[in-house]
């Protein structure tokens, strides 16, 4: 019985410590749900585990050409403006599927660092989508505000789109 009580006390102390850690990590976060705060706090461990296990890494092979050039396409920015991808010629372009309520939401921090560091050579385009377990429920305006306030995102975000049809 004493061991059980000791175990429960240790468990409660660990939980309380983790709750305090989550609050400290998110002290400057604005309008985040507790789930978003929790995911932001555990993101470094999630990324470490992902790298350790080799999950989410894929190398594409083959010489298959796309039916149309990327630079012949246009997209809608989340403010309603049209982005002509021809304007991006001469730069590397990174397309990223994003969501504000998933385990990888903190990737916005790293993406913004990349955008800042390579601003003359790299364009990052964020494509928010709600296809995966309702992880992007907000409107385009809410998404943009969330990303700017909590992660300092300045790279272009496209209109919320559908990845899976």
Language-model segments: what does each one mean?
Residues 1-14:
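N-terminal Sec-pathway targeting helices
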Residues 104-165:
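Structural microenvironment flanking redox-active thiols in thiol-disulfide oxidoreductases
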Residues 91, 98-101, 128:
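Short pre-active-site segment immediately N-terminal to redox-active cysteine/selenocysteine motifs
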Residues 90-93, 122:
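Alpha/beta-hydrolase fold active-site loops
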Residues 16-35:
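Membrane-interface motif at the C-terminal end of an N-terminal transmembrane signal
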Residues 30-52, 138-140:
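Periplasmic c-type cytochrome electron-transfer domains
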Residues 43-86:
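N-terminal "domain-start" segment that seeds a small globular fold
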